[in-house]
Amino acid sequence: MPEINTSHLDEKQVQLLAEMCILIDENDNKIGADTKKNCHLNENIDKGLLHRAFSVFLFNTENKLLLQQRSDAKITFPGCFTNSCCSHPLSNPGELEENNAIGVKRAAKRRLKAELGIPLEEVDLNEMDYLTRIYYKAQSDGIWGEHEVDYILFLRKNVTLNPDPNEIKSYCYVSKEEVREILKKAASGEIKLTPWFKIIADTFLFKWWDNLNHLSPFVDHEKIHRL
């Protein structure tokens, strides 16, 4: 694996690079494990290294979506606006369990606490809706990137927020119209979006959002959308 100098990067974020992500093939079958660092190096991504990930879309009871701006300390896509929480299940027994994506949901609960400070007792795994999976690949810069099969999780609940500033620069609940304005600002270069959020916003998000009370027709655990 390539040697990359990380001495100029945020110390806490560098420590997280040692976490073990779940390596998969393009059909989301587990084939091994590797560090978060190796999974996010473009040099390895170009050779086909692919890992499992998730994106949480958290709505309050007014049906507003929680958006976050990633902190400037983040190694991939710093300062970009994105959905409520995005991360990876780890290669451990609890987060590898695949039945009804329970392992991914456990990872999401862990990261909702780590990033947004949401108390563990406020997140019930049974309240998370696993909708579908999305495959994508994107470069953050010349060194780092993403290559993931992304599990889409919806959660509608009022929660307590206490974000970690090392993870999150800013956050807000937004309406559909406000998201459309954010997409326009991103298109004009005023702000930056993560590539996965832009892909989802351009394709499925508003259709799903219109049907928060009846998501079952949109559940598809067989197909991986390759966007």
Curated annotation (Swiss-Prot):
GO terms for molecular function: isopentenyl-diphosphate delta-isomerase activity; metal ion binding. It is found in: Peroxisome. GO terms for cellular component: mitochondrion; peroxisome. Binds 1 Mg(2+) ion per subunit. A motif (Microbody targeting signal) lies at residues 225-227. Its cofactor is Mg(2+). One of its GO terms (biological process) is dimethylallyl diphosphate biosynthetic process. It comes from the Eukaryota. Residues 49-199 form the Nudix hydrolase domain. It catalyses: isopentenyl diphosphate = dimethylallyl diphosphate. The active site is at residues 86, 148. Belongs to the IPP isomerase type 1 family. Monomer. PANTHER family: ISOPENTENYL-DIPHOSPHATE DELTA-ISOMERASE, ISOPENTENYL-DIPHOSPHATE DELTA-ISOMERASE 1. This is Isopentenyl-diphosphate Delta-isomerase 1. The lineage of its organism: Eukaryota, Metazoa, Chordata, Craniata, Vertebrata. The gene is Idi1.
